[in-house]
Regions:
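Phosphate/dinucleotide-binding and metal-coordinating scaffold of catalytic cores
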Residues: 1-153
């Protein structure tokens, strides 16, 4: 796989890099990081993705990763807002995977190197953001914005 024809997202579990999700020719592929596999007490992402050094191909890993995304109308609205196909699991994970429900997150880079900042809002700014929600579900594509998606399935 070359960088030119493969896209990758880091897969993080409880803040530690557990593996890499790749996309090549429309097919997903997940591989655990060697460091994660050697970690005492390492936890698999799922029973369907046991701790193995071999990569998991599309059929084995897609159900787990697609299951991290919102479903139904919310998914359609996020896809439309981000101008991504509703069926593009990888594309949606690349945009909102940093805010998956649960302990797993997906990032194109290392979130530890990102500079986290808090932007305190005035009441009128908060009202404006809330007004955006019907057109911009979960404020998708808002630069640097991170939310908790717990329960947003």
């Amino acid at each position: 796989m070359t960088a030119a024809d493969t896209m990758e997202l880091g897969v993080w579990l409880l803040g530690e890099r557990a593996g890499t999700l790749g996309l090549k020719n429309g097919r997903l592929r997940f591989r655990y990081e060697a460091r994660w596999l050697q970690k005492p007490g390492a936890t698999p992402l799922s029973q369907s993705l046991p701790l193995l050094a071999e990569p998991f191909e599309d059929q084995a890993c897609r159900p787990f990763f697609a299951g991290l995304l919102p479903e139904g109308e919310l998914r359609r609205r996020i896809a439309a807002q981000c101008q991504i196909s509703y069926a593009n699991d990888f594309g949606l994970l690349a945009v909102i995977g940093g805010d998956c429900a649960g302990a797993v997150s997906l990032e194109p880079g290392d979130p530890a190197t990102a500079v986290a900042a808090v932007e305190w809002l005035e009441p009128d700014q908060l009202i404006a953001l809330l007004a955006e929600l019907p057109q911009r579900p979960m404020l998708a594509q808002r630069d640097g914005l991170r939310l908790s998606l717990a329960g947003a399935q």
